[in-house]
A protein has these predicted regions:
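Bacterial N-terminal signal peptides that target proteins for export
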Residues: 1-9
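Divalent cation-coordinating acidic motifs and surrounding scaffolds
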Residues: 63-83
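Ligand-binding clefts/hinges and TM-proximal coupling segments of bilobed small-molecule sensing domains
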Residues: 134-135, 142-157, 230-299
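Bacterial N-terminal signal peptides
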Residues: 8-17
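Pocket-lining segment of extracytoplasmic ligand-binding domains
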Residues: 86-88, 94-104, 112, 125-129, ...
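An extracytoplasmic/periplasmic, membrane-proximal ligand-sensing/linker region
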Residues: 177, 194-215, 225-227, 268-339
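Boundary at the C-terminal end of the N-terminal hydrophobic targeting segment
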Residues: 18-25
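Bilobed "Venus flytrap"/periplasmic-binding protein-like clamshell domains
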Residues: 25-53, 57-60, 121-184, 194-195, ...
Length: 339
């Protein structure tokens, strides 16, 4: 009788402990961009790593129409993780463009916690038309798919076009149809981009099977105007695209993207998350070459990301701790650490 009672008691304690441990698992619904986008692929890879290495968290990848939707979703309590860029954070900070009128309704303030890669924007047309377009201004009035309406990639091109005085006809298309529409003349061009200076998003890789596209670079005068307007400029070799791009280099305009969480995830957990990412970054880069930049220099890339957005939104204390330990923190950011 005593033995049976003891066994039952031990079993009950084990079950109770298991229930407590289970209740301590924090659910992280993490918003990202649409299936087929670079952001969706990258978060799937990251979530697999973090779910394995941080069993106290359960990350679920939540695709949305675009990254800006995830920033707004976090601010309204819909997501615990979000996919945010310096472009989106600028618009949020200044209550403009896609965030016009949004700040007044926010329930919580987004913060920056992990910078992942640059997204590097350019333009492509059909190879048969490459002789027609010697500059971006040559695309004035043309029908272009610059990305889905909420996408930061589209916002980056819109900013560049504004700086150059380019007006075009926006054509929204299904990602899976972009290649066939370019082939058939339904669109004259699309927004071309890489992530991490090395990865082509799945939808462009798919489009490359349906059509032969050529990169179009800004002219020298356009590049000078873009640099004067504050744009960074990047040149990539054609080999990055693993196909003939019909030019000897591809000129792109990079901006910074990250997978961020808010203060609901404590400092120690964000710090641990960053150290786990750094320890396993080769695995991430092998699964998705978007992670090539942080594989080369994780602390240095965090500094670049924070530099791009330090004045736009607060910095998670876990990221600040990581950067201080790595020697890449600037004391001028002390006042920007979220409380």
């Amino acid at each position: 009788m005593f033995k049976r009672t003891l066994i039952a008691l031990v079993a009950g304690l084990i079950a109770a402990w298991g229930a407590v441990a289970w209740s301590q698992v924090k659910e992280i619904p993490w918003g990202t961009s649409a299936v087929g986008s670079a952001g969706h692929k990258a978060l799937v890879v990251l979530a697999e790593l973090l779910n394995r290495e941080m069993p106290n968290f359960r990350i679920t990848v939540q695709p949305t129409p675009g990254a800006v939707v995830t920033v707004k979703g976090y601010a309204m309590g819909q997501f615990e993780g979000y996919y945010g860029s310096d472009i989106a954070f600028y618009e949020l900070r200044n209550d403009t463009r896609r965030f016009a009128g949004f700040k007044a309704s926010m329930k919580r303030q987004p913060v920056q916690s992990f910078w992942t890669y640059t997204t590097d924007m350019g333009l492509a047309v059909h190879a048969r038309d490459k002789g027609k377009y010697k500059s971006w201004r040559d695309l004035t009035g043309k029908a272009l798919f610059t990305g889905m309406p909420p996408w930061d990639t589209r916002a980056q091109l819109e900013r560049a076009f504004d700086a150059l005085g380019i007006k075009y006809t926006y054509r929204q298309v299904d990602l899976s149809a972009a290649g066939s529409l370019l082939q058939g003349g339904g669109i004259d061009g699309f927004g071309l981009y890489t992530t991490g200076e090395s990865a082509v998003p799945p939808w462009i890789a798919e489009a490359s099977l349906a059509t032969d596209w050529a990169a179009v670079n800004p002219s020298a005068a356009e590049l000078a105007a873009l640099k004067k307007a504050g744009f960074a400029v990047l040149e990539l070799k054609p080999e990055v695209f693993k196909r003939n791009v019909h030019t000897d280099k591809v000129v792109l305009l990079p901006f910074y993207y990250g997978f961020h969480v808010g203060l609901e995830v404590p400092e120690n957990d964000v710090y641990r998350m960053l150290t786990i990412i750094e320890k396993n970054v080769a695995e991430l880069a092998k699964a998705d070459s978007s992670y090539a930049q942080i594989a080369k220099d994780m602390p240095g890339f965090q500094k670049l990301g924070v530099t791009s957005a330090a004045d736009l939104l607060p910095i998670h204390p876990g990221l600040a701790r990581y950067m201080r330990e790595k020697g890449v923190w600037d004391a001028k950011w002390d006042a920007r650490v979220a409380k």
